[in-house]
Amino acid sequence: YGFRYAAIRRTIAEEEDKSYIRTTLFVAPFYGLFAGQKNWGALQAFVPIDDENTMLYFVRYNLKQPVDDKERERQIAWSGLIPGIDIDDNFRMTRNRENDWLQDRAAMEDGKSASGLRGVQVEDAVIQESMGPIFDRSTEHLGTTDIAVVRMRRLMLQAVRGFMKDGKPPLGLNEQIPYERLRAEEAIISQNTTWQDVCKLGQP
């Protein structure tokens, strides 16, 4: 398995004693599950190719209704992942570090785009790729908002050390977790309730 965490925010339209929560799951060794609005969810798999390259698989799904061709095309365009335009024949993003991700500074100046980038996946890629293939973590200065990053790294290091030193099974191979039921969730909850009580792990 891995771990999960929740973002907890004050609501705008609900009563003052309500909170909006959204959970995110890290599932070892390289999966992320993210909640979305209107029953949408997302799965990302960052599969290592070698020490400096990673293949990203991005899946969008709806828990309540089928996704028809029109909606599928809309989701692909929203993500900035249109084959032949955003993705080349080798599955590489056409907007990349070499061309500054084709950032449109004019659109930013005109107020037409906050980032000047096409698609949410490109925005994420800029953050990831701009660090370079291998980043020197010793120069990082993580803060309290990075607690999930800290926890994930600690978890992975513990798993590696446990495997190398004591022969413990790798993370994800020795837990009785119903993987088919793991999902990220969002909800409006009472401030007197914990998000763990509302979003119970592994329940349908």
Where are these regions (language model features)?
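C-terminal catalytic domain of Rieske-type non-heme iron oxygenases
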Residues: Y1-P204
